[in-house]
Protein backbone atom coordinates (compact mmCIF):
# COMPACT_ATOMS: atom_id res chain seq x y z
CA UNK A 1 0.00 0.00 0.00
CA UNK A 2 1.40 3.35 -1.04
CA UNK A 3 1.18 6.33 1.27
CA UNK A 4 0.26 9.77 -0.02
CA UNK A 5 3.01 11.27 2.09
CA UNK A 6 2.98 12.44 5.68
CA UNK A 7 -0.38 13.35 7.19
CA UNK A 8 -0.76 17.12 7.49
CA UNK A 9 -1.53 18.44 10.93
CA UNK A 10 -4.82 20.29 11.09
CA UNK A 11 -5.92 23.27 13.14
CA UNK A 12 -9.62 23.65 13.93
CA UNK A 13 -10.20 27.33 14.73
CA UNK A 14 -13.63 28.20 16.16
CA UNK A 15 -15.76 31.18 15.24
CA UNK A 16 -16.70 32.71 18.59
CA UNK A 17 -19.65 34.98 19.27
CA UNK A 18 -18.28 38.41 20.22
CA UNK A 19 -21.01 39.48 22.61
CA UNK A 20 -19.43 42.84 23.46
CA UNK A 21 -19.04 43.86 19.83
CA UNK A 22 -22.53 42.66 18.95
CA UNK A 23 -23.91 44.68 21.88
CA UNK A 24 -21.91 47.74 20.83
CA UNK A 25 -23.31 47.55 17.30
CA UNK A 26 -26.87 47.11 18.60
CA UNK A 27 -26.40 50.18 20.80
CA UNK A 28 -25.40 52.14 17.69
CA UNK A 29 -28.72 51.22 16.04
CA UNK A 30 -30.68 52.17 19.19
CA UNK A 31 -28.80 55.44 19.55
CA UNK A 32 -29.60 56.47 15.98
CA UNK A 33 -33.29 55.63 16.48
CA UNK A 34 -33.51 57.53 19.77
CA UNK A 35 -31.93 60.65 18.30
CA UNK A 36 -33.85 60.38 15.04
CA UNK A 37 -30.60 60.36 13.09
CA UNK A 38 -29.68 58.46 9.96
CA UNK A 39 -26.73 56.16 9.49
CA UNK A 40 -23.62 57.41 7.69
CA UNK A 41 -23.51 56.93 3.93
CA UNK A 42 -22.40 53.34 3.36
CA UNK A 43 -22.62 52.36 7.03
CA UNK A 44 -23.69 48.78 7.80
CA UNK A 45 -26.06 48.65 10.76
CA UNK A 46 -26.55 45.35 12.57
CA UNK A 47 -29.96 43.81 11.97
CA UNK A 48 -31.74 41.84 14.73
CA UNK A 49 -30.90 38.47 13.10
CA UNK A 50 -27.17 39.30 12.81
CA UNK A 51 -24.37 38.78 15.31
CA UNK A 52 -20.65 39.50 15.23
CA UNK A 53 -18.26 36.56 15.49
CA UNK A 54 -14.50 36.47 15.60
CA UNK A 55 -11.81 34.02 14.62
CA UNK A 56 -8.54 34.33 16.51
CA UNK A 57 -5.75 32.97 14.36
CA UNK A 58 -3.71 30.89 16.79
CA UNK A 59 -1.20 30.56 13.99
CA UNK A 60 -0.90 33.05 11.17
CA UNK A 61 1.60 31.63 8.74
CA UNK A 62 1.63 28.51 6.61
CA UNK A 63 -2.08 27.81 6.76
CA UNK A 64 -4.01 26.18 3.95
CA UNK A 65 -7.80 26.18 4.09
CA UNK A 66 -9.22 22.67 4.31
CA UNK A 67 -12.92 22.99 5.15
CA UNK A 68 -15.66 24.69 7.11
CA UNK A 69 -17.05 22.81 10.08
CA UNK A 70 -20.56 24.22 10.55
CA UNK A 71 -23.31 22.48 12.51
CA UNK A 72 -26.84 23.66 13.23
CA UNK A 73 -28.58 21.69 15.97
CA UNK A 74 -31.94 22.29 14.27
CA UNK A 75 -33.17 23.13 10.76
CA UNK A 76 -32.39 26.64 9.56
CA UNK A 77 -29.87 28.75 7.70
CA UNK A 78 -26.80 30.88 8.46
CA UNK A 79 -24.90 33.24 6.20
CA UNK A 80 -21.28 33.91 7.18
CA UNK A 81 -19.88 37.15 5.79
CA UNK A 82 -16.29 38.17 6.43
CA UNK A 83 -15.28 41.75 7.09
CA UNK A 84 -12.11 43.60 6.26
CA UNK A 85 -12.63 45.63 9.44
CA UNK A 86 -9.95 45.74 12.12
CA UNK A 87 -12.52 46.63 14.71
CA UNK A 88 -12.69 49.52 17.08
CA UNK A 89 -16.46 50.14 16.91
CA UNK A 90 -16.30 52.95 19.43
CA UNK A 91 -14.10 54.77 16.89
CA UNK A 92 -15.07 53.25 13.55
CA UNK A 93 -18.46 52.15 12.23
CA UNK A 94 -18.67 49.12 9.96
CA UNK A 95 -19.13 50.15 6.33
CA UNK A 96 -20.78 48.02 3.66
CA UNK A 97 -17.63 48.25 1.52
CA UNK A 98 -15.83 46.32 4.27
CA UNK A 99 -18.02 43.25 3.78
CA UNK A 100 -16.20 40.56 1.83
CA UNK A 101 -17.62 38.58 -1.08
CA UNK A 102 -18.52 35.85 -1.44
CA UNK A 103 -20.41 34.89 1.72
CA UNK A 104 -20.66 31.28 2.83
CA UNK A 105 -24.22 30.03 3.28
CA UNK A 106 -25.01 26.89 5.27
CA UNK A 107 -28.40 25.34 5.89
CA UNK A 108 -30.08 22.30 7.34
CA UNK A 109 -33.41 21.13 5.96
CA UNK A 110 -36.35 20.13 8.12
CA UNK A 111 -36.15 16.42 7.22
CA UNK A 112 -32.36 16.05 7.44
CA UNK A 113 -29.50 15.99 9.93
CA UNK A 114 -26.99 16.78 7.16
CA UNK A 115 -25.70 20.27 6.45
CA UNK A 116 -25.75 21.72 2.94
CA UNK A 117 -23.84 24.76 1.71
CA UNK A 118 -23.02 26.88 -1.33
CA UNK A 119 -19.87 24.89 -1.97
CA UNK A 120 -18.05 27.07 -4.52
CA UNK A 121 -18.53 30.32 -2.59
CA UNK A 122 -17.74 28.72 0.77
CA UNK A 123 -14.55 27.23 -0.69
CA UNK A 124 -13.46 30.53 -2.25
CA UNK A 125 -14.16 32.39 1.01
CA UNK A 126 -12.26 29.78 3.02
CA UNK A 127 -9.24 30.02 0.73
CA UNK A 128 -9.19 33.81 1.22
CA UNK A 129 -8.99 33.23 4.98
CA UNK A 130 -5.60 31.54 4.54
CA UNK A 131 -4.29 34.73 2.91
CA UNK A 132 -5.94 37.02 5.46
CA UNK A 133 -4.42 34.99 8.31
CA UNK A 134 -0.96 36.10 7.17
CA UNK A 135 -1.76 39.74 7.96
CA UNK A 136 -4.38 39.40 10.69
CA UNK A 137 -4.43 38.10 14.22
CA UNK A 138 -8.21 38.35 14.38
CA UNK A 139 -10.88 38.13 11.69
CA UNK A 140 -14.43 39.37 12.22
CA UNK A 141 -17.58 37.96 10.66
CA UNK A 142 -21.22 38.96 10.47
CA UNK A 143 -23.38 35.89 10.81
CA UNK A 144 -26.98 36.22 9.72
CA UNK A 145 -29.38 33.72 11.26
CA UNK A 146 -32.49 32.68 9.37
CA UNK A 147 -35.37 30.26 9.38
CA UNK A 148 -35.64 30.01 13.16
CA UNK A 149 -32.01 29.54 14.22
CA UNK A 150 -30.03 31.78 16.55
CA UNK A 151 -26.49 31.84 17.97
CA UNK A 152 -27.24 29.09 20.50
CA UNK A 153 -28.00 26.71 17.61
CA UNK A 154 -24.68 27.23 15.80
CA UNK A 155 -21.29 25.63 16.18
CA UNK A 156 -18.83 26.82 13.54
CA UNK A 157 -15.12 26.60 12.91
CA UNK A 158 -12.63 26.73 10.07
CA UNK A 159 -10.20 23.85 9.61
CA UNK A 160 -6.76 24.61 8.18
CA UNK A 161 -3.87 22.35 7.22
CA UNK A 162 -0.51 23.39 8.60
CA UNK A 163 2.03 23.51 5.79
From Swiss-Prot:
Subcellular location(s) per record: Cytoplasm
Keywords of the record: Acetylation, Cytoplasm, Olfaction, Sensory transduction
Main subcellular localisation: cytoplasm
Cleavable signal peptide: none
Biological process (GO), any one: neurogenesis
GO terms, molecular function: peptide binding
Modified residues (N-acetylalanine): 2
Source species, domain of life: Eukaryota
Tissue: Uniquely associated with mature olfactory receptor neurons.
S-S bonds: none
GO cellular component, one term: axon
Function: May act as a modulator of the olfactory signal-transduction cascade.
Family: Belongs to the olfactory marker protein family.
Subunit note: Interacts with BEX1 and BEX2.
Protein name in UniProt: Olfactory marker protein
Species of origin: Rattus norvegicus (Rat)
Gene name of the encoded protein: Omp
Amino acid sequence: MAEDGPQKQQLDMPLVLDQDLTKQMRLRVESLKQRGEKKQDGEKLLRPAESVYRLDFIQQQKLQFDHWNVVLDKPGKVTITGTSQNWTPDLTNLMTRQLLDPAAIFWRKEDSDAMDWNEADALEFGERLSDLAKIRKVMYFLITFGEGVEPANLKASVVFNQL
